Amino acid sequence: MSSLDLFHYEKPTLLEFDSMVRCQGYASLAGVDEAGRGPLAGPVVAAAVILPAGIGLSEVDDSKKLTSGKRDELFEVIMANALAVGVGLSDAGVIDRINILQATLAAMKEALSLLFIKPDYVLVDGISKIPVTIPQKTIKKGDGTSLSIAAASIVAKVHRDRLMVSYDAEFPQYGFAAHKGYGCVDHLKAIAEYGPCPIHRMTFSGVKEHVKNCEG
């Protein structure tokens, strides 16, 4: 097997993947990802990021693979270098009303609408398309495939984490700064003891069992 043949069997880097998409005629490429689909409290946050073509952000990766300190560091790098960034969110009330999938897509649509540069093409993490007319491609594990999606995953995660830290000051009994709303043992115990607060997702297991107790 020649070195050229070997290249075709190797997974492209995140930057190479985006470059291949741009070579198809899309100059303005946006990556979209979300953070916070699974937690019992707080919003789901989506980010849309347009990076300059060929930018070398070698440390940018799926946000879940990075430490919080590294995410914060890369967040600043992305915000300083991106051509455009949009952040959208759906709060707990919206999630309860229309379900987490539709709330996620609504947040993604909002994030795209807040870009001051309109993208030619959108790469979306996951399997569900955003309800917009812009051409798009969904990619399973897209944050490990596309640099633009990986950047969006970091922006969404850091933005949401900072929101949850701010909620911790308002509702200190739940420990939001530590677990960011996820259903860990300490969080479940706090819900059982204090009942849900206004940012809890009342339709989610782990919360809904205590809604009547809260209302009664």
From Swiss-Prot:
Q: Which residues bind a divalent metal cation?
A: 33-34, 125
Against Gene3D superfamilies, the record matches this protein to: Ribonuclease H-like superfamily/Ribonuclease H
Here the disulfide bonds are none
Q: What class of enzyme is it?
A: hydrolase
**UniProt cross-references to CDD domains, sorted A to Z:** RNase_HII_bacteria_HII_like
* Metal-binding is among the record's keywords: yes
Which cofactors go with this protein?
Answer: Mn(2+); Mg(2+)
According to its UniProt record, the EC number is 3.1.26.4
For this UniProt record, the keywords arranged alphabetically read as follows:
Cytoplasm, Endonuclease, Hydrolase, Manganese, Metal-binding, Nuclease
Q: Which Pfam families match?
A: RNase_HII
GO function term, MF aspect, one: RNA-DNA hybrid ribonuclease activity
This chain's function reads: Endonuclease that specifically degrades the RNA of RNA-DNA hybrids.
This protein's name: Ribonuclease HII
Give the classification, highest ranks: Bacteria, Pseudomonadati, Thermodesulfobacteriota, Desulfuromonadia, Geobacterales
